[in-house]
C-alpha cells in the first residue's frame, strides 16, 4: 500500500518519514485527485483530513498569523464591505463593522505591516475579558480568506467522494464552527448547503455517504489536559456507499 500526505507548508518537509510507502505532496489537498493520478492511483481506501493549523504554524513568528509575536503581517487587506464580510462570516466577530472602521482609518495614514501594529490599531474594540478569544477569531477570519480554506475544503470533499472506493472511509477533524458546518452538511447530504438532492422521476435521494458516527466525536477532558489545542476539535466519519 501507499500513503499520500498533503501539506502546503514547506516546513512540513522536516517531518517527512523516510519510508518508501509514504509520498509527501507539498500542495493543498484541493489537488487530491490530480496528485493521486500523477502517482498512478485512481482510488483510495480511506482519506483523513486534519483541518487544524499545526502547532508549528501557531508558534512560528514569521507566519504573521499568530497575534503573540511581532512579525510582518502576511495578510491581504480588502475593501471595507469585503473586509466586514470576512470578519463576520469567517470569524463570527460580533463588532465586525467597528473593527473594519478602525482598520480602514489606520490604513489611510500608513500601511499595516506587522502583527503588533495591527493589534494596536484594533485594541479599542477588543473586549477586555475576552482578548485572546477575540483575537483568535480575527486572525482565523483573515487566515481563511487568505488561504481560501473553505473553498479548498469543499473541493477536497467533492473529490474524495469520487476517488474513495465503495466502503472507503472519509474522516475529517474540524476546529471551528464554519468548517464543521460544511463538513457536517456534506457528509449528510453531499453538498456544503446540506440540501438533499432527489431523483426528478422517482424522488429517490442521491447521496454517496452514510455516517459512521451519528454523534460527533470530541476530545475527552484527559486529552484536553494533555493537548489544550485539541479543545475545539470535532471528528466526523462517513463511509462511501457500495
Language model segments and positions:
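S-adenosyl-L-methionine-dependent methyltransferase catalytic core, i.e., the SAM/SAH-binding region
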Residues: 1-242
